[in-house]
């Protein structure tokens, strides 16, 4: 049954639901039900169209940015006049529209142009899903206007800094720096995964045409686009640093940025080069200018006698592989004296010095020494190739895979996955294991914890991930957003029911949509910026997500402050800084439900009322 806009509106006025007592409270920022006003300035009466949002992003200031579609009087979604697509940033009551189709391009550059894509208006603004630490937003899309030719120079990327006017970064057919007239490709729009830093710079791989382009010899480049002059990082056919007689072709994927530090991969070209030794890994970290090759496929691993970087596969990189100090984290397949029992490792490199953080065959606390026969004697195999994240303070969070001690894979349905963390001091922690009970949910256990958790971590030492779960007795499935840190341990932030064709008891939170949600989505492995931080989970603990009850067609975007001291005043239900009659009314309205549960026991009751009255007055 569809929830009325009145119900949703009443919920928004309360706006919050207590999560775990130590964390903050969920704030619903936007509701898409086709009826609740979007609250966008200058667009009176507009409502969000259900199921049209991309993943929201959030900066250190807690402001959220996302793209979506609107409907209402004077709004159309077809043809050349479509004006239904917007990119916004802010909070309820203070949204800023950064871009809208059939409105001027950001900063009116190029002059007189509008954002428009007649053939595909829903994509006239590209969902770049990126925000810098300080709140700068990437904008990208298609345009029409003076001097614009469709399919030639009608795409562009802009940057809206945290303060000040937006700037044009790149446009189709711009001249590539460091070349004699070679041009950027026609399509200069950017999508998810672009790593923009707070200056407005981002590495961008592109094909080149015209000018001094010579067939396939030099027809591609990796460029650092940004305000002012772009910078050529490497062009296809450039000399390989430190390897005379060889050239490099930069790869079209896997380019990473943290401030001014760049890391990327490429392929060598030259006499004697084969698929066994052609992959190289380059960075400018540790240099005052230029690039260096810090590792090559088939070479010996410096500092580890007998080990080589095996030629069976290239390195894989997690979400934020390059740290502030230039340390690069990667997963490598090892050769030489390595065997099938220990031939892969999570490694780091800093200025030529290599370290092994985790290696295949290592013991895992809570698994190798477990009394549970499902885990006893099992050892570490590998992390998920992209489901891992190194924070700036040295915490390595990962989705882990375990194996039998003899190196054989664990046969399904036996549990073979876990979520773990390696602390900065080297301590290995098992956060949770596949088949473990879900804390606080009787009868529920974790399903596989590999490949779909959207794991993220921040500089405060908090790890957040989305885990699937099951209640086999009840025949139900669902998912939970979990948080973990050393101080507070493992706890649930939100939960969702799975869709079912048979009657079942909904387990999803009603926090977000007023009805039990069946979808909760984190931004995933693309949620990283060029400042070394996350875009869905900020370095100071702000987390944002999408939640939905697709049965009733209700969708929402919400945020929460996660981590120790995330909520110093849980009795402040409406978040206005004072515990007063409004908070009492909100608590009484939720009596007997799970919201707002001040003490985290799952029910709003007399204990919560006592806690609220004891905290009456200004929050500390």
Predicted segments with their positions:
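Aromatic-enriched hydrophobic runs in primary sequence
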Residues: 4-7, 275, 473, 595, ...
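Exposed boundary/loop context
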Residues: 2, 193, 319, 570, ...
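Cellulosome-associated attachment modules in secreted, modular CAZymes
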Residues: 563-620
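Conserved "turn/edge" positions that cap or connect secondary-structure elements
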Residues: 21-567
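Sec-dependent, cleavable N-terminal signal peptides
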Residues: 1-23
């Amino acid at each position: 049954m569809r929830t009325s806009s009145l119900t949703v509106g009443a919920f928004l006025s309360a706006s919050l639901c207590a999560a775990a007592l130590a964390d903050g409270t969920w704030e619903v920022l936007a509701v898409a039900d086709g009826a609740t006003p979007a609250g966008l300035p200058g667009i009176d009466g507009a409502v969000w169209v259900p199921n049209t949002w991309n993943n929201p992003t959030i900066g250190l200031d807690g402001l959220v940015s996302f793209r979506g579609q609107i409907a209402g009087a004077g709004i159309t979604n077809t043809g050349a006049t479509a004006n239904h697509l917007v990119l916004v940033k802010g909070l309820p009551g203070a949204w800023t529209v950064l871009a809208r189709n059939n409105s001027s391009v950001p900063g009116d550059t190029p002059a007189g142009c509008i954002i428009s894509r007649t053939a595909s208006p829903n994509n006239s603004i590209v969902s770049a899903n990126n925000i810098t630490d300080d709140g700068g937003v990437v904008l990208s899309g298609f345009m029409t206007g003076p001097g614009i030719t469709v399919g030639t120079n009608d795409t562009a990327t802009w940057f809206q800094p945290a303060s000040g006017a937006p700037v044009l970064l790149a446009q189709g057919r711009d001249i590539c720096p460091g070349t004699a007239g070679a041009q950027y490709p026609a399509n200069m729009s950017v999508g998810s995964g672009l790593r923009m830093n707070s200056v407005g710079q981002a590495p961008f791989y592109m094909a080149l045409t015209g000018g001094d382009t010579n067939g396939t010899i030099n027809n591609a480049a990796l460029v650092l686009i940004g305000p002012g002059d772009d910078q050529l990082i490497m062009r296809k056919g450039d000399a390989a640093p430190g390897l005379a007689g060889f050239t490099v072709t930069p790869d079209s994927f896997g380019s990473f940025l943290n401030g001014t530090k760049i890391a990327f991969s490429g392929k060598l070209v030259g006499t004697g080069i084969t698929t066994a030794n052609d992959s190289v890994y380059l960075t400018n970290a540790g240099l005052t200018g230029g690039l260096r090759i810090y590792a090559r496929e088939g070479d010996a691993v410096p500092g580890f006698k007998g080990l080589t970087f095996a030629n069976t596969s290239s390195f894989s990189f997690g979400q934020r592989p390059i740290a502030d100090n230039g340390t690069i984290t990667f997963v490598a397949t090892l050769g030489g004296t390595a065997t099938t029992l220990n031939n892969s490792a999570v490694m780091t490199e800093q200025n030529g010095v290599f370290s092994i953080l985790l290696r295949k065959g290592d013991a895992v606390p809570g698994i190798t020494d477990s009394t549970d026969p499902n885990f006893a004697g099992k050892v570490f195999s590998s992390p998920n190739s992209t489901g891992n994240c190194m924070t700036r303070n040295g915490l390595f969070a990962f989705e882990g895979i375990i194996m039998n001690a003899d190196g054989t894979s664990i046969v399904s349905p036996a549990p073979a996955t876990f979520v773990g963390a390696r602390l900065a001091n080297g301590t290995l922690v098992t956060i949770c294991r596949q088949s473990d009970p879900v804390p606080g949910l009787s009868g529920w256990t974790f399903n596989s914890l590999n490949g779909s958790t959207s794991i993220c971590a921040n500089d405060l030492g908090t790890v957040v991930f989305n885990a699937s779960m099951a209640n086999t007795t009840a025949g139900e499935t669902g998912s939970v957003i979990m948080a973990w840190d050393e101080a507070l341990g493992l706890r649930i932030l939100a939960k969702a029911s799975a869709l079912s064709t048979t009657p079942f008891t909904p387990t999803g939170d009603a926090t977000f949509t007023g009805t039990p949600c069946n979808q909760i989505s984190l931004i995933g492995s693309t949620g990283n910026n060029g400042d070394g931080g996350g875009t869905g989970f900020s370095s100071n603990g702000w987390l944002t997500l999408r939640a939905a009850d697709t049965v009733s067609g209700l969708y929402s975007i919400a945020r929460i402050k996660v981590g120790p001291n995330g909520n110093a005043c849980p009795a402040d239900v409406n978040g206005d800084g004072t515990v007063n009659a409004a908070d009492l009314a909100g608590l009484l309205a939720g009596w007997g439900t799970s919201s707002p549960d001040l003490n985290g026991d799952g029910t709003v009751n007399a204990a919560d009322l006592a806690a609220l009255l004891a905290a009456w007055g200004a929050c500390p």
